[in-house]
């Protein structure tokens, strides 16, 4: 069953911009965790607003991108689903955060915020058309990563500095300093999903995810643990000091590979673990390369791993144990439940079925490997 009701869709709503925006808001925030739960989306929106300027910048970016997409006549269903708007949300929030931490001039921050909203929307539309048509995959948050990296240089070139301070958060007052360092790193990875750095915010995000999708929370946990363990084997600290800069990539890879694109099962659980470890390796490599340009890795490691792994799996006829999810509007629990029901109703679904074209006695007039026809792909055909 779906944990929470997803709401009904009315065709008349597609003609109303305000109604479409209201429908898109919770989906835009929930889709970051590959969730379709509306209550979880509203919770993520509220947690984003715990850092008012960052949260409002992201919300305003979503509204601006929705209006622009409406004017450009982007598919209304794509707007309402949040797929067209979550990259502007991420890009606008990240640009304002970078501007506040770097001490950029207010006018520069506003200009780059507007550029992030427009560029990320257009890049999402363009890249989704290309990636979707060739690999059948979502563009992920790759447009936001590209836009933020490029506009970051604009801000620095205007006289701004690199990250020099921390932004105050309403949840920083509930940070638990006595918490073990490993747990600090774990919850701070979840806090980074709402552009915060306190373990208290991470606890709230994690609790919301557990209530929304227990399977999604399991996959995120496994992805993070695998990534943090990989960093530890590379000689880096496993706690907050060693994972805060990239830990959210691990949990996103776990959710995407374990419960986003695949129906949750034992094989997808293993894929989530492998994906988390691969993301850690890619993150370390990218940190060296991007450090030359004064950039952090952002969400690039997770994007590269998820797109690379899923593109490879798309080329396989049927990966052992993995079942590609045929539904994009269900929670992981709903997908798993429907697959169990389908397996009981159609136990031989994946076995080929051969039926004769008629009943009774028939005469075969031409058999296998005919001299003139029935060659190549058709060599096993029979004429009756």
Question: What residue ranges belong to the model's regions?
Answer:
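N-terminal signal-anchor module of multipass membrane proteins
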Residues: 1-74, 148-151, 188-196, 200-212, ...
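Long hydrophobic alpha-helical segments that form multi-pass transmembrane helix bundles
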Residues: 142-195, 326-336
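Membrane-helix interface "capping/anchor" motifs
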Residues: 51-55, 71-83, 101-107, 125-137, ...
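Transmembrane alpha-helical segments of multi-pass membrane transport proteins and ion-pumping complexes
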Residues: 54, 58-74, 88, 92-93, ...
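Structural signature of hydrophobic alpha-helical transmembrane segments
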Residues: 48-61, 103-116, 186-198, 238-249
């Amino acid at each position: 069953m779906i944990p929470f009701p997803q709401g009904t869709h009315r065709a008349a709503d597609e003609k109303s911009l305000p109604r479409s925006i209201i429908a898109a808001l919770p989906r835009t925030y929930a889709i970051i965790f590959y969730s379709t739960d509306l209550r979880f989306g509203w919770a993520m929106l509220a947690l984003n607003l715990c850092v008012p300027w960052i949260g409002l910048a992201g919300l305003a970016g979503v509204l601006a991108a929705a209006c622009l997409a409406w004017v450009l006549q982007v598919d209304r269903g794509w707007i309402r689903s949040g797929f067209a708007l979550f990259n502007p949300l991420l890009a606008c929030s990240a640009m304002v955060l970078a501007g506040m931490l770097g001490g950029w001039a207010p006018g520069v921050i506003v200009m780059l915020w507007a550029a992030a909203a427009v560029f990320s929307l257009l890049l999402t539309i363009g890249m989704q058309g290309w990636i979707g048509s060739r690999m059948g995959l979502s563009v992920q948050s790759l447009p936001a990563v590209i836009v933020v990296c490029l506009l970051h240089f604009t801000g620095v070139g205007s006289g701004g500095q690199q990250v020099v301070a921390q932004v105050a958060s309403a949840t920083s007052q509930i940070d638990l300093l006595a918490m073990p360092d490993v747990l600090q790193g774990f919850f701070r990875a979840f806090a980074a999903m709402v552009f915060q750095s306190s373990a208290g915010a991470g606890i709230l995000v994690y609790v919301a995810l557990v209530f929304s999708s227990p399977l999604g929370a399991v996959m995120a946990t496994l992805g993070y643990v695998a990534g943090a363990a990989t960093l530890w084997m590379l000689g880096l600290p496993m706690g907050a000091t060693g994972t805060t800069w990239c830990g959210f990539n691990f949990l996103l890879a776990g959710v995407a590979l374990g419960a986003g694109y695949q129906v949750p099962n034992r094989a997808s659980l293993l894929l989530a673990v492998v994906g988390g470890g691969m993301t850690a390796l890619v993150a370390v490599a990218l940190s060296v390369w991007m450090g030359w340009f004064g950039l952090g890795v952002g969400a690039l490691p997770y994007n590269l791993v998820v797109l690379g792994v899923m593109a490879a799996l798309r080329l396989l006829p049927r990966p052992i144990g993995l079942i590609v999810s045929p539904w994009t509007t269900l929670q992981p629990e709903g997908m798993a439940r429907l697959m169990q029901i389908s397996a009981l109703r159609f136990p031989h679904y994946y076995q080929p079925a051969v039926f004769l074209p008629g009943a009774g006695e028939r005469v075969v007039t031409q058999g296998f490997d005919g001299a003139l026809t029935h060659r190549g792909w058709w060599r096993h055909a029979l004429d009756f």
